[in-house]
Structures are given as C-alpha cells and as structure tokens.
Amino acid sequence: MDLETGEVSADSLQEGEGFVEDNLPTNGNSDTTENNIIDPFGDIFKPTQWVGNTPVRWSTCGTHPTEHPCNFVLLDQNGEEFQLYDHYDKAIVVDFSAGWCGPCRRAADVVQEHSDTFAGDGLLYVTVLIETATGEDPTVADLQAWADDHNITSAPVLAGSRALLESGGGDWALTGWPTFYFIKKEMDMHITMRGWSEEMLVELIEEILE
C-alpha cells in the first residue's frame, strides 16, 4: 500500500491513512435476536427493490464492485426504521463506525458537511454505528448522542451490531475501522475505503455521482 495516497490495487479497495484494525473480540451482545436489527437473516436481507409496483429481486448480493449490496433494515437516531433499498435512486455512502474508534469520530465530524454539500446531487450519507465506546450494541439514545456530539442534524445514524458483519455471520466485509462503502444510484457497489481520508472521501463521492 502507498501510505501517501492510500491506494491499494487488490480488489478495488482504497485505504486511508488512519484506521483501526478489527482485531478485537466480539462483545457478546451481537446476538441475532438483538432488537437493533430487524429479522437479520430473514427476507429483509434478500435483495429487493421496486420499479413502480413491481418487486425486483437479485439472486445474489455482496460487497465487491458491481455487485448489489445486501439490504438491511435498522433503527435510526429518531427510532424509525431505515431500509437501504428504499433509496435505490440515490448515490450512497455507508460508513461503518465504532464509538471507541478515533478515526471514526474524526470522520463523523464532517458527515453533515458533506451530506449537505452533495445532497442536491442525490447523495445519501449513512452512518452505521456497530459498537459504542464501551463495545456495546448501540441503542437509539446512543445514536442520538453520536449525532449530537458530531453535529449530525439530518444524515441517518443507524444502530448496527456485529451480526451485520461477515465476522458475525452477516454480509458486510470489515477488517478495519472506519470502513466506507460507495454505492451508485443503480444500487451497484463501486468501491470500498478502509480508514479515514477526507480528501479521498470527497473524490469517491464525486465518482459515484458521475
């Protein structure tokens, strides 16, 4: 990896200068019955989108470029359900963060700024908080505190858990914090960025808006 640019040639991964390796044990609270995740291994995770009144299902989903991301339904900081596939026609940044991760907190400080800057172009910036600062699954109150601490006023902050991640039996690959997925408006994966680089974030947002 080139530490100056953060570029990695393997499997279209971009890597920022600052990240935290995900080598911590799970906290033991990421049970698949956790209320933060609604039916995590049922139909809600099957790839579904609507064209008019017609449901469309993809036979596979994944995290590699050109694949369709796997759907999720999670609670946001207002206690309302957020479903990824409801936003089929938007370019989406999905930011997987943890409360104990320093680079994640630095990234969170500019979420609302970039969300506002690119909102008119059709960008949706989504934070999925996997763990709190103490390693617990986040509650709605934790999401509200995260949003308040980082001046996030409208961008969704969602309650995740390790059940979402491949290491916990889920579909989303994560080996370091934060990890960002960049998704095009057609709900196609574009690229992944591990670690924090604001310059690279903006460049990749512009790419998915092209």
Regions found by a protein language model. Name each.
Residues 126, 141-185:
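Short, internal strand/loop/helix patches
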Residues 63-67, 85-88, 117-120, 149-152, ...:
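Extracellular/periplasmic catalytic domains that process cell-envelope and extracellular macromolecules
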Residues 89-91, 106-129:
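Conserved helix-turn-beta segment immediately C-terminal to the redox Cys motif
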Residues 90-92, 96-100, 132, 176:
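Short pre-active-site segment immediately N-terminal to redox-active cysteine/selenocysteine motifs
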Residues 18-85, 154-156:
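N-terminal "domain-start" segment that seeds a small globular fold
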Residues 96-113, 135:
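Conserved redox-active cysteine motifs that mediate thiol-disulfide chemistry
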Residues 175-210:
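Thiol-/selenol-based redox modules, centered on thioredoxin-like
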